[in-house]
Amino acid sequence: MRVGLDLDGSLESLGNSMTDLADALEAAGGCTLVRFRTRSRAGAGDAALASRMWWSPWWRRGLGRSIDRLLPPVDVVHVAGVSTPPTRDVPEIVSVDDLRALREESRTSQRAAQLRRVIARGAVVVASSQVARDEVLANLGVARDRVVVVPPAVPNLDLTMDGDALVVNVTGAVEHFIRLAPSLIDAGARLEARVIALTSTAAAQRIRSGGIDVDLMARRDARRALGQARVVVHVSDGARFPSFAIAALAAGVPTVARSTPINRELLNGASELAESDGDIIEQVKDLWSNEPRRALARAAGWARAADFAPSSAATAYLNLYGDVVRGWGS
C-alpha cells in the first residue's frame, strides 16, 4: 500500500506530529510512504510538487489541481491542517485537529464549506477524539461514517524527574487563565515555585496587558517548558487535542485539568480532573509535595500516554488506510 502523507499539516508545539507519524509508519513497515509538503518547500526525501506555490491558495479552499496528479503513484492521500487539495483517482483522508475555525462565526462558512467539499468528493475526515467527532458532525451535518476518530501522534519525550516549576499550558482559554492566575501565583509563592505560562503570541500579549506576573514562554519552547515542570496545569477551550498534557504524562509530570468532556474522554484516570478552579489549586498543592500520590500519578500517566505514542497512531492509521483503500469506489 502506497501512502502520500502531507508533512505540513501539524499544529503541535512539541514537534511535527505528521513527521512523527511518518517515521512511525516507516518503522512499522506496513506501507510505502511518499512524503510531500503542500505549504512549504520540499525537504530531502520529499516528493516535490510542481507549481506548489500557485496551487497552495486553491488547496486551502479544497480546490485546484488534484494532488495525486502531482505525486508518484499512491493508493491513498493523507493531509491535515488547512490544505485539502482534491484527489482524482485515489481516496483522501483529512485530519482535523483544530476546531476553532468551525467555531468562529467569521470563518465558519469557509472552513465548513471546504470540509463539506472534500467529503462530497469521497474523503474521510479524521477527528482526534469522540468529543471532537461529535462537534465536527454537528457543524458539517454529514453522515456519521464520513468522520472517524484517530488521535494524533504525541512525541516520546525524555522523563522530567527534577522539575521545579508550575507550568500552565494555555490553549485558546486566555480569559480563563487570567481569572485563575492570581490563585496560581499565590500557590506558586507558597510552594516556592516559578509559574510559567506556555501560550501563543496573542495570548502572551493579552496576559502582559493584564499585568499578570508569570514567566511567559512561546509554544515553540514547549519541550523546554516541560523539561522544567514539576506539575502541569492544562487550561484549554477544548478545540485542540491535549497533546501537551499527554506529553507531560509521558514525561512523568503529574497533570491537572478541568473536568470537561474532552478531558474526561482522554485524560480521566491519568490526570487529576477538577470540577472548579478552586479544586485545581488544591490538586496542584497536593501533587507538588505528596510523593506517594506523585508516584501513582506518574504510573497512571505513563500507561495512558502509551495509547497516544507515535507507534500507536501509526497502527491506527495503517488500519484506516487499508479500510479506506478497500472501500474506494465500492
Tell where the protein language model's regions lie, with residue ranges.
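Carbohydrate transferase catalytic cores enriched for Leloir-type hexosyltransferases
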Residues: M1-S330
